[in-house]
Amino acid sequence: MLLLSLTLSLVLLGSSWGCGIPAIKPALSFSQRIVNGENAVLGSWPWQVSLQDSSGFHFCGGSLISQSWVVTAAHCNVSPGRHFVVLGEYDRSSNAEPLQVLSVSRAITHPSWNSTTMNNDVTLLKLASPAQYTTRISPVCLASSNEALTEGLTCVTTGWGRLSGVGNVTPAHLQQVALPLVTVNQCRQYWGSSITDSMICAGGAGASSCQGDSGGPLVCQKGNTWVLIGIVSWGTKNCNVRAPAVYTRVSKFSTWINQVIAYN
């Protein structure tokens, strides 16, 4: 079996909660908006972030990686003071959920981010006050720089993005979808030279991420631990479920992420 150019080892961030182990276990059908996804189990993806403006409009996802840091996509253009990190959300139509709404003190975008090529599409958000871990809020593990993943491994992406490439219908409940990973070479067969070594591709098998999922997680399970291997970045405008979606390859940025956290 081919290997994606990336050994799955973990960078532990956080407190005694550790990382990547939800208190509430996810339930996956692996059968098939996200597009062609399904409702997640309440609280089963505790690192999922909703990025919102002051009106409560959800515009991007993100992943909690420690009590003070969230990782998202650079193209989400998060502005401290104008945008907020919302933790613990599941049903966006509910006003009764135990949410944590946190201000952003700093948004640190990778210095080589290119909005034309979408290369290096990653931003770190420092929270103005630390998140409080609960059964519904805890961090994900980061893939390390020497990550290796087998082709065809099924991973999961989550979010509240559009349910279809047509129209603007978004779900109330957090969606999840299992997606197979594809190699860089396979992805380049569809996207050509747009795919760089700093990207990872998944999907093309009847399901996809879509607009509004941007910045959110692509996670794979190792044993009982979930590891963040991708950040939702880009794909077809109509969210074609037969085309692989493109994610920022977290392993290429784990050293930079840890350096930013250490010095800020």
UniProtKB/Swiss-Prot annotation:
EC assignment: the record states 3.4.21.-
Cysteine pairs forming cystine bridges in this chain are: C19-C141, C60-C76, C155-C220, C187-C201, C210-C239
The Gene Ontology biological process annotation of the record reads:
protein catabolic process; proteolysis
What region holds the Peptidase S1 domain?
34-262
Q: Where is the active site?
A: H75 (charge relay system), D121 (charge relay system), S214 (charge relay system)
Note the InterPro entries from the entry.
Peptidase_S1_PA, Peptidase_S1_PA_chymotrypsin, Peptidase_S1A, Trypsin_dom, TRYPSIN_HIS, TRYPSIN_SER
Glycosylated position list: N114
Protein name from the UniProt record: Chymotrypsin-like protease CTRL-1
